[in-house]
Amino acid sequence: MSWQEKINAALDARRTADALRRRYPVAQGAGRWLVADECQYLNFSSNDYLGLSHHPDIIRAWKQGAEQFGVGSGGSGHVSGYSVAHQALEEELAEWLGYSRALLFISGFAANQAVITAMMAKEDRIVADRLSHASLLEAASLSPAQLRRFTHNDVAHLARLLASPCPGQQLVVTEGVFSMDGDRAPLAEIQQVTQQHNGWLVVDDAHGTGVIGEQGRGSCWQQQVKPELLVVTFGKGFGVSGAAVLCSNTVADYLLQFARHLIYSTSMPPAQAQALRASLAVIRGEEGDARREKLAVLITRFRAGLQGLPFTLADSRSAIQPLIVGDNARALHLAEKLRQQGCWVTAIRPPTVPAGTARLRLTLTAAHETQDIDLLLEVLHGNG
């Protein structure tokens, strides 16, 4: 088989399974509204959970940062790309979340991969929740360590895997809020079992940070858990992009030496770091509290209005509200019907989710209004 035949076969297989992904160029893709092809839709596909992507204070901070520092960092943080803006953001994040250090990364994917590839050796073992993000599972699969997966949120299964002999160290990997189901990990129980077996815990709280807990400190703070490594991202609750790893001083020093994604990548622009500092100020303050409270009210209203629909609603109290449809073609058809009626919704299909669990991944944000939720419910009931 030639290269072209190999590529064509892979694409044909995706088409046959109604699993071929495509992108839509949008004029606006975050916030309450999505604009595409000169049409405006209520946006139920954005991760901008607090509606901060268009916040004037954050936009102003980015502009001022660009005027002060320029539009790029100019290099890796190990060379010339670590600015006083980066340093200030790291210090503020560490203080906010109760850690000694924070290290910035260009994306959550990079942060997750950096942690696992830097920490793990051949004699070690990674024990990951089966539904962990692709960045975590891919890094674990490619690392020299043994990878074992435990049944989703099943602490007893995790304990059995940790109890089997391992010549090296054990790293338990999970998420705070799961990206495709919207449910939460029992972090206190997971940490207890991990500590009983002398392991370390990594929590990716991409979808919890900024959105839940006191001052938006996320899943771990809410459950009174402090993992050895906490990954937070800035493309969701913060409304910007990028990520950080929170850890001890010694682990931070170690990652600065061995995390290749950090060493060999150009740092985020200092202006972006300034915007993130402004976003953090909103998240921690009274306005952040108000946005989280509004989002919680909208989530409750949405779930209460779904009674009678012939879909499986995931057990989620987060901004992620998946409607499990099952069949790929049906999920695509339903997403298109909703778009025709003014609601932009994305169909998520295998391999992103397990076979037979194609879904509409609905996301609610603090930018939405009550009437937006009511319209979405009306459209869903009309197409159920």
From Swiss-Prot:
Query: GO molecular function terms here?
Result: 8-amino-7-oxononanoate synthase activity; pyridoxal phosphate binding
Q: Which Pfam families does UniProt cross-reference here?
A: Aminotran_1_2 (PF00155)
Q: Which CDD domains does the record associate with it?
A: KBL_like
Q: Which reaction does it catalyse?
A: 6-carboxyhexanoyl-[ACP] + L-alanine + H(+) = (8S)-8-amino-7-oxononanoate + holo-[ACP] + CO2
Q: Which residues carry this modification: N6-(pyridoxal phosphate)lysine?
A: 236
Keywords from the named record: Biotin biosynthesis, Pyridoxal phosphate, Transferase
Q: Could you name the domain of life of the organism this protein comes from?
A: Bacteria
Q: What is its EC number?
A: 2.3.1.47
**Which cofactors is this protein said to need?**
pyridoxal 5'-phosphate
Binding residues for pyridoxal 5'-phosphate: 108-109, 179, 207, 233
Which GO BP terms apply? biotin biosynthetic process
* Binding-site residues, substrate: 21, 133, 352
Complexes and interactors = Homodimer.
Q: Which NCBIfam families match?
A: bioF (TIGR00858)
- Membership in a protein family: Belongs to the class-II pyridoxal-phosphate-dependent aminotransferase family. BioF subfamily.
Please describe what this protein does: Catalyzes the decarboxylative condensation of pimeloyl-[acyl-carrier protein] and L-alanine to produce 8-amino-7-oxononanoate (AON), [acyl-carrier protein], and carbon dioxide.
Q: Please identify the protein, giving its name as recorded.
A: 8-amino-7-oxononanoate synthase
Q: Which organism is it from?
A: Escherichia fergusonii (strain ATCC 35469 / DSM 13698 / CCUG 18766 / IAM 14443 / JCM 21226 / LMG 7866 / NBRC 102419 / NCTC 12128 / CDC 0568-73)
The encoding gene is bioF
